[in-house]
Amino acid sequence: MMKKTLSIAISAVVALAIVCTLIYMFAFRTLTVVSDSAFSLVLPKSTMRDLRSSMFFKGIRVKTAFLDDEAFDNAEAFKTSLGKVKGSYVLLGPVSSAYAESKRINVSDLLNESTVIAIYGKKSSLFDCVLVSDEKSGWVKVAQELSSEFEKTAQNVALIYENDAVPYVQDIKDCFSDSRLTVFEDDTQSRLFATETLKKTDELSIVVAMCPYDGHLSDFFKTTGTLSWVVDYRFANAVPKKQLYGIVVPSLSRSLKAVLNTEKGASAVSNLEYDYEKL
């Protein structure tokens, strides 16, 4: 009798699992993230895990579609590859979005059964919605957390950036008292900047540096160092793992929640918000 009861219970669980799987596969709407060799290399796996979890509770299944390098050979190859993508929503990565814009490919028309969302720098009629990157929001969070973290220590935090490349420097500075932040502005474009900066951070016993952008970032790692770094997620691979303190990453889940109700053909604009992920 017990074996029969157990068998019935197991069968019921299996049946429920099958039903849930069918609901997930066929009843849920679909968000397809269009990736490429560049985007897949730098986008943290944690970002996609968070997106899948967040969208699940919205009744949306997340999947990915990959465009290989040949898809960017010419406009026709791009349209052929992208035209195969299906989904209630289609999110284009930065490279795909920029390519479509450069070739003036109307992706909203190409994928006429999907709401097309692009990661791009400005409003465009080629997509149904554009997420404009707001890196400042992420770097302000970094500054606030590091300011709080090192408030009771004798150590300063460094801000290293390339001249004129980071428009929100003052917003970062405002999170610190003048005595707790040491700023290194790369305005010489000299390769000696990295050597001189590392020497100075060592003299000041600085252990963590924020670097929103510096074209010479790799110069800081030509020799073994102890300085820890917070960088944009796109440059994380340039930093030795043992020196990577944190990254600033796009919050796809939070940003997409705000645009799920976008109507087809709306040419809407919204912010792509960023978060600080301490490693």
What kind of feature is each model-predicted range?
Residues 34-35, 86-97, 117-119, 158-161, ...:
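Periplasmic-binding protein-like
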Residues 72-88, 106, 190-204:
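Short, well-structured alpha-helical segments in soluble
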Residues 227, 233-279:
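Flexible loop/turn connectors
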Residues 105-133, 234-241:
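Flexible loop/hinge segments that line or gate small-molecule binding clefts
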Residues 32-76:
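Extracytoplasmic "Venus flytrap"
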Residues 123-148, 240-253:
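Short beta-strand elements at the ligand-binding edges of bilobed clamshell
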Residues 9-23:
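Hydrophobic membrane-insertion alpha-helices, especially the h-region
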Residues 137-180, 266-279:
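An alpha-beta-alpha
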